[in-house]
Amino acid sequence: MIVLDDQTCPVGMIGNLMKFFAHESCGFCTPCRDGLPWVDSIFRDFEAGRGSEKDLNILKEQVDYMGPGRTFCALAPGATAPLGSGLKYFEDDFKEHIKQKRCTYKN
């Protein structure tokens, strides 16, 4: 469990986790080798104000694509837990990034 205060952007926090998971991938299986860097790049787009509804849908698809039973190890499925939870509980924050074309937690 990760606890955030009201000054911390959940999109940015989840993006930081995805960057970590993408960096730690050994590249053996396709979901890790291709999926995690793709997810990381989408989060960088959100942070830069270039996120879109299409990107949001791709992130949702990646939760299933990288989930348990689809990879050699537990790295990508481990990444889907915070990604899936973040999309479920903070979808409005993602949509606000899209609408405002920026992170609303930063001044």
Regions inferred by a protein language model and the residue ranges of each:
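Redox cofactor-anchoring modules in respiratory/redox and cofactor-processing assemblies
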Residues: 1-107
